[in-house]
C-alpha cells in the first residue's frame, strides 16, 4: 500500500493523554470499550465538521487499522447549510417540535440536526457499501463518532487524488473506476454532491481497487432532490478537471447526460 507521509504520525502517539479534548477522548474510548480499537495512532484530517483518526484495530475485527471520524461539538463545528443539500430533507423531521426548532435555529434544533447529519453519513456509507460502491467499509456508529475502514497504515493515510502522483495509464484506470462508482451511486439513487479530488483516496499499488470515495453526509437522494442533476454534473466536471490536466480524454457533460438519461429510464 502506498501512503502519503503524515507529519502527525510520528509525534502524535498516545493522544489520549495529550491534546485530545475530553469529549473526543470519550467518543474514541467507546470504540475501545466495544473491543473495536486498541490505540489511536494519529490524526489524519481535521476539518470544520469532524476530525478523522487512524486507529489500531482490535484483532477481533479482522482489520489491522480503522479510521474513527469524530464530529466536533456543536459549539466548534460548522455544518454545510446550503439550501440545495436540504431540499426535500424536511421529511427527516417528522416531529413538529423538532422541525420548528431546526427551522428557528435553536440550540435544540441544531443538536437534532447534528445527530441526523452524523446518522446520514452512517446510513449513506452502509447503503453505498452494500451497493458495491468503493466507500470505506462501515464498522460502527456510536453517538457522534463513526468507525470505518482505514485506507492507509501506521505510517500515514493513502493520498487524496489531489496529491496523488499517477502515470497517465494509472490516471486513466482511476478515472474509469471513479466513473463506474458514480454510476453505481446513482443506480442506488445517490449523488455525492461534493465530489472532488479532495475526497477521493488513491492507492496506486492496487489498480483494480485503487479508489475510496469519502465524506458522504451531504449526499442527496436523486429521486427527491430537484438539484440532483446539477450536483451530479458538478461532481463529474470537478473531478474530471484533475484528470484532464494529466492527459485523460473524455466528455464529462456527455457522460453525465447519458448516465442521467439511463437512470431516469431505469436502465442502470
Predicted regions: what they are:
Residues 1-21, 30:
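N-terminal, Lys/Arg-enriched amphipathic/low-complexity engagement segments
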Residues 135, 196-202:
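Catalytic-loop Lys-Pro-X-Asn motif of eukaryotic-like protein kinases
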Residues 170-174, 186-192, 203-268:
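C-lobe/activation-segment region of protein kinase-like
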Residues 56-59, 202-206:
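Short, low-complexity Ser/Thr-rich regulatory SLiMs
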Residues 1-3, 18, 66, 250, ...:
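N-terminal targeting/trafficking signals and adjacent low-complexity tails
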Amino acid at each position: 500500500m502506498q501512503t502519503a507521509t503524515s507529519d502527525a504520525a510520528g509525534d502524535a502517539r498516545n493522544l489520549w493523554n495529550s491534546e485530545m479534548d475530553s469529549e473526543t477522548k470519550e467518543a474514541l474510548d467507546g470504540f475501545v470499550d466495544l473491543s473495536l480499537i486498541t490505540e489511536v495512532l494519529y490524526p489524519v484530517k481535521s476539518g470544520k465538521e469532524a476530525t478523522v483518526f487512524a486507529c489500531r484495530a482490535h484483532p477481533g475485527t479482522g482489520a489491522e487499522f480503522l479510521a474513527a471520524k469524530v464530529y466536533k461539538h456543536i459549539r466548534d463545528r460548522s455544518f454545510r447549510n446550503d439550501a440545495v443539500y436540504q431540499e426535500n430533507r424536511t421529511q427527516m423531521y417528522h416531529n413538529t417540535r423538532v422541525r420548528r426548532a431546526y427551522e428557528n435555529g435553536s440550540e435544540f434544533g441544531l443538536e437534532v440536526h447534528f445527530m441526523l447529519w452524523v446518522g446520514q453519513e452512517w446510513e449513506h456509507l452502509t447503503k453505498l457499501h452494500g451497493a458495491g460502491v468503493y466507500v470505506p467499509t462501515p464498522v460502527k456508529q456510536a453517538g457522534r463518532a463513526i468507525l470505518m475502514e482505514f485506507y492507509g497504515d501506521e505510517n500515514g493515510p493513502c493520498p487524496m487524488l489531489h496529491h496523488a502522483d499517477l502515470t497517465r495509464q494509472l490516471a486513466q484506470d482511476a478515472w474509469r473506476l471513479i466513473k463506474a462508482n458514480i454510476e453505481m451511486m446513482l443506480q442506488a439513487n445517490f449523488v455525492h454532491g461534493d465530489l472532488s479530488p479532495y475526497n477521493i483516496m488513491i492507492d496506486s499499488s492496487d489498480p483494480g481497487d485503487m479508489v475510496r470515495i469519502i465524506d458522504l453526509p451531504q449526499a442527496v437522494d436523486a429521486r427527491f432532490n430537484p438539484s440532483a442533476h446539477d450536483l451530479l454534473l458538478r461532481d463529474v466536471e470537478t473531478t474530471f478537471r484533475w484528470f484532464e490536466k494529466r492527459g485523460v480524454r473524455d466528455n464529462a457533460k456527455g457522460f453525465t447526460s447519458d448516465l442521467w438519461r439511463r437512470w431516469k429510464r431505469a436502465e442502470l
